């Protein structure tokens, strides 16, 4: 089974415009994310962007990048365009890795890839325990709510995504912003 990692990235983010090109230790955030994805060694990695500046930066740092339309409403739309332009027929899963996750643990990417392939699920995602009570009320942190504690045995269950949490008795996790989906499911999601 083959996996493709696509990292959507654009300069016009609402909270912090230009974020992908901000430097950490002399390297742009988007190039850090690309390197982490490549280091996971689970498949080819591409950045999908509408911005020439991001394309230039990623290429300068040895990354693969596809220029996409600037008309997309979501990163998923951008990812699907990239996938179509690549015209790869043997991809079983596409991992959507957000372009602002330079601290992503490559073992988490490997684990997600292994789980979706083992269980042959249509969609998988990553969530982490919320260790700080103040993060529960932070609307900028996307939450995952489940009816039971997430463990390795039930990781593949469906979850609801919420930004505003009112009932703190639920099992609430921080959504990491990484998805894995079968290409045909991604196509349905963007339709």
Question: What are the residue ranges of the model-derived segments?
Answer:
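N-terminal glycine-rich phosphate-binding loop and ensuing alpha1 helix
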Residues: 1-49
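Short beta-strand segments
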Residues: 8, 96-98, 126-129
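Residue-level signal for inorganic ion chemistry
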Residues: 30, 100, 182
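Residue-level signal for alpha-helix termini/capping positions
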Residues: 38, 84-88, 117
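Short, high-confidence coil segments that cap the C-terminus of an alpha-helix
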Residues: 42, 88-91, 119-122
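Short phosphate-binding loop-to-helix
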Residues: 46, 52-111
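Conserved core of the sugar-phosphate nucleotidyltransferase
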Residues: 104-191
């Amino acid at each position: 089974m083959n996996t493709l990692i696509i990292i959507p990235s654009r300069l016009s983010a609402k909270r912090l415009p230009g974020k992908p090109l901000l430097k950490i230790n002399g390297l742009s955030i988007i190039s850090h994310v690309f390197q982490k994805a490549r280091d996971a060694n689970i498949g080819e990695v591409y950045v999908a962007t509408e911005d020439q500046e991001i394309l230039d930066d990623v290429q300068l740092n040895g990354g693969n990048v596809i220029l996409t339309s600037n008309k997309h409403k979501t990163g998923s739309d951008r990812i699907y365009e990239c996938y179509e332009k690549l015209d790869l027929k043997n991809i079983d899963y596409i991992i959507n890795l957000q372009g602002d996750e330079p601290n992503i643990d490559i073992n988490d990417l490997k684990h997600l890839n292994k789980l979706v392939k083992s269980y042959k699920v249509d969609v998988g995602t990553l969530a982490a325990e919320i260790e700080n009570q103040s993060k529960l009320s932070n609307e900028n942190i996307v939450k995952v709510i489940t009816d039971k504690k997430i463990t390795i045995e039930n990781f593949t269950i469906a979850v609801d995504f919420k930004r505003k949490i009112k009932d703190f008795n639920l099992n609430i996790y921080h959504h990491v912003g990484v998805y894995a989906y079968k290409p045909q499911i991604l196509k349905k999601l963007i339709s």
